[in-house]
A protein has these predicted regions:
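Terminal amphipathic alpha-helical/low-complexity segments used for targeting or macromolecular assembly
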Residues: 1-203
């Protein structure tokens, strides 16, 4: 369903791209360009996305940094949570810690909401207040060779609510790895992670 009174767009990243050709929006995420995937995420969440021109000041504005990957579920959760003041996305849990480790000191902002009224400015984007989101994560265990890695397994936090920068090639790689499972489950089974887990538990 379309959300009234809001619109989405991009703001440019101050972080230099590393390791792969740019621009960031043309790099590949989950089989298509990052720019296309991000636009779909907003549109699937019911939010009009405008790639060019200033956004209308009489609407609430969601602004995502040009190098950031975001899923529909992350957009939906953030849109449901924002109020009447400017806000910036933050996420807790293991996923938040994992993405923070991969950010190489880049703490954003990556996604902000600016309330209606007043222009979009870099200062306003930077001053948006943090809004901590529930990551709704699941931990998946992957076996390792204890002789080589010093541990028998590693736990990765997987969530439908993924949002992370991709300016560095390693970040883009992880964005594809972390996003692949939820992407495949949603597209092949028409379900989110929780529904898949419940379906599996019921079958057992």
């Amino acid at each position: 369903n379309k959300r009234n009174g809001v619109v989405a767009g991009r703001f440019e990243s101050p972080v230099s791209l590393e390791g792969l050709a740019g621009p960031a929006t043309e790099r590949i995420w989950l089989g298509r360009s990052l720019g296309e995937r991000v636009e779909w995420s907003f549109m699937e969440a019911g939010i009009e996305f405008r790639d060019e021109g200033p956004l209308p000041e009489d609407r609430g504005r969601f602004l995502i940094r040009s190098d950031v990957a975001v899923t529909r579920d992350a957009v939906t959760a953030f849109a449901d949570a924002v109020g009447t003041t400017d806000a910036r996305w933050e996420v807790g849990g293991r996923l938040g810690n994992f993405v923070a480790d991969l950010s190489f000191g880049d703490d954003g902002p990556w996604l902000v909401y600016l309330a209606p009224g007043g222009p979009v400015t870099p200062e306003r984007i930077a001053q948006a207040e943090p809004l901590t989101m529930d990551s709704k994560e699941r931990l998946l265990e992957f076996p390792l060779s204890e002789d080589h890695h010093g541990a028998s397994m590693v736990e990765l936090p997987i969530s439908d609510r993924l949002l992370m920068p991709t300016s560095h090639w390693l970040q883009l790689l992880w964005a594809n790895l972390l996003g692949l499972g939820p992407f495949l489950w949603r597209n092949l089974m028409g379900s989110n992670i929780l529904q898949v887990a419940l379906r599996g538990a019921w079958a057992a």
